[in-house]
Amino acid sequence: MNVSQNLLIEGWRGINHSYALINQYQIRELLKNDDFKIYFKDIPFPTPEWNKKNNSSGLKDFEEKISKLTQPSNKLKIDILYRISFPYRMHGGNANKIFVFGTSEYQKIDNMIYQGEELNEKYINKSIKVITSSNWSKVGFIKEGFKENDVIVIPCGVDLKIFKPINKEKKIKIRKKLNINNDHFVFLNVSAMTWNKGINKLLVAFSEIKRKYSFAKLILKDQSNLYKETAKNYISITKKKFPNLLTDEVLSNIIVISKNLTLKELSELYGSCDAYVSSYRAEGFNMPPLEAAACGIPTILTSGGSTDDYYDPSFVLKIEGTKKTLNDGKNYIEPDLESLISNMSNLIEKRNSLLKKNKAISFIEKNFTWKLISKKLSDLFIND
C-alpha cells in the first residue's frame, strides 16, 4: 500500500481568474488520487475587487470541496509544494520538491517574480522547477536563466461535461436573447481587452467583413470585472484611430457582454456562435479557443504562438503572423490583417473542408481533458 505524500498547494481559489480556474480544475482531479494528501494555503488576491462575490469561479459542483482544504500545521513535513499565483514566488519553500506555475506571454518575465520584504524572499531558489502551459511560454523562463530541463510544459485542459455542443433549439433561444437571428453569422471573442489580445486587429477585420457580408455580427465578451478594461472603451479607442472603418453601421453589429457568466452560460455562448476568433499577439496558452472547439465551433487563431501546441486542422484556421520584439525585449506575433479577413470570409462561405466538429471534439478528448492534464501533473510530482 502506497503512503500518501503531503502536497501543499499555495495559490488562488474561488474566482474566475485563469490561474485560479486552472488550479481548481487540477485540484478536482488530484483529489481523486490516493497518492496525495492535499493541503491549501490561500495567497492574497492583488486587489479587493478580485473576490468570490464579484468574480465567482462558476465551479459550483466542486467549489465547496475545494474550499474545505486547509492549511497544514507548521510541524507537518511537506513532500511537494506547488505554487500557482502571481507574481511568481520563486523564493525559499520548505519541501522536498517545489514547483511554481507561471506563464510568459511575451517570452519575458521581468517584474513578474515576487519580491517580498524578507531577505530570503528576494532570491530565487535554484532547486525550484517551473511548470508552464505552452512551448511559447517556456522560452521566457529559459531566457530568465532557468535550465531547460527545469521548465516543464503541461498544457491547460477542457471540461467536456461543461463545454459541449448545444442543440438547435437552445442555440435559437440564446441568439434570440442577444437579438441575433438564424441568418446571422456570428464571430466571438472572449478575453481581457488588452493589447496582447489583438482586439484592435479583430475590430478592423470585422469592419471589412461587415461591408462584404451584411449578416455578420461580432460578440466581444470582456473580463472587465477582473481587469477594468471594457470592450466598449476599447472599441471607442479603436474608432478614434479608424473613424472611417468603425462606422455606426459596423458598431451596431458588435455586441458587448461585460457581466460575469457561469461556466454553463459561457459554454452556451460558445455554442450559439458560428466561429471563435483570437487574433492575439501574445498568450501563455489561450484557453477559450479550446473551450469553443469543444462546444462545436471552428476557431481562427494566430499562427506561431502558444496555440500552435493544440493546433489541429479539424477546428483551427491559422492567421499568418510575423514575430516581432518590442523595445523592452518582449516578443509577440503581429497577426496579418489580410490573412485574418481571408479566414473570416472563408468560414462564412464554407470553404474549409477540413473543419470537422466531431473530429475536433475527439481530438480534445484524447489530448486535452483535465483528467489527462492532471495525470501529467501528478506524474511529475511523483516521478521528478
Residue ranges and their predicted role:
Residues 298-301, 317:
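Short hydrophobic beta-strand element within catalytic cores of glycosyltransferases
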Residues 8, 181-197, 203-206, 218-219:
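Conserved donor-binding/catalytic core segment of Leloir-type glycosyltransferases
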Residues 8, 49-129, 135-142:
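Extended catalytic core of nucleotide-activated donor transferases of GT-like folds
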Residues 335, 339, 351-381:
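A charged, aromatic-enriched C-terminal amphipathic alpha-helix characteristic of glycosyltransferases
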Residues 228-264:
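Nucleotide-activated donor-binding/catalytic signature segment of Leloir-type glycosyltransferases, i.e.
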Residues 142, 158-177:
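Acidic anion/phosphate-binding donor-loop and adjacent secondary structure
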Residues 281:
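Aromatic "clamp/platform" in nucleotide-sugar-dependent glycosyltransferases that forms part
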